[in-house]
Amino acid sequence: MYVMTQSGWLELICGCMFSGKSEELIRRVRRAQFAKQEVKVFKPTIDNRYSEDAVVSHNGNSVIAIPVATPAEMFRYISAATDVVAIDEIQFFSDDIIDVVQTLADCGYRVIAAGLDQDFRGEPFGPVPALMAIAESVTKLQAVCTVCGSPASRTQRLINGAPASYDDPVILVGASEAYEPRCRHHHEVPGKPKKRYNHPLAGHTGE
């Protein structure tokens, strides 16, 4: 990777649940703090699974965060003394987050964002695809499929132990009892529209 000669850029950490996104964000935040940089950490108010005022990884590591309801609220807490802005669960924000992140990066701030790239349906999640396009650096993490042990890129939503229907609400914040990491082949979404094309090699096993 080339060395940045100008300050101000976006680093995006994405992937499915349990892939270590928050853990990686916390690692980068702590590294910046160790370097005596001033860091402001934000999270959406909707994310209160483990804490209302901290980013908490599934491993139990945490860093203090400021909960905000809208992206524009972040500007109230950021000053000229701020070096790094970190944002967790960025998929839960409106598309306004795109302009906020662009503005911060253009003004010379290092922005570290983490979030789900796909919703439980296996479809692009909120503003994350656009953020992936404009980021200087994208780190896509994978978990381990709970069914077969293969690399997992999708999030399986379970309601009373059964796969959630395609028509269920996209946003439903939960933890391990509601979600599992799954690979492409074990990701189940009852009611999901069929693919447009039926590939003639659909029976190909890849072996």
UniProtKB/Swiss-Prot annotation:
Catalytic activity: thymidine + ATP = dTMP + ADP + H(+)
A Pfam match: TK
Chief place of localization: cytoplasm
Active-site annotation: 89 (proton acceptor)
One GO cellular component term: cytosol
Biased composition annotated in UniProt, kind: Basic residues: 184-198
Recorded GO MF terms: ATP binding; thymidine kinase activity; zinc ion binding
Keywords: ATP-binding, Cytoplasm, DNA synthesis, Kinase, Metal-binding, Nucleotide-binding, Transferase, Zinc
GO biological process, one term: DNA biosynthetic process
Subcellular localization: Cytoplasm
EC number from the UniProt entry: 2.7.1.21
Residues at which ATP binds: 15-22, 88-91
Residues engaged in binding Zn(2+): 145, 148, 183, 186
PROSITE patterns: TK_CELLULAR_TYPE
Coiled coil: none
Start and end residues of each stretch annotated as Disordered: 184-207
Record-stated family: Belongs to the thymidine kinase family.
Annotated PANTHER family: THYMIDINE KINASE, THYMIDINE KINASE, CYTOSOLIC
NCBIfam families for this protein: PRK04296.1-1
Subunit structure: Homotetramer.
Record protein name field: Thymidine kinase
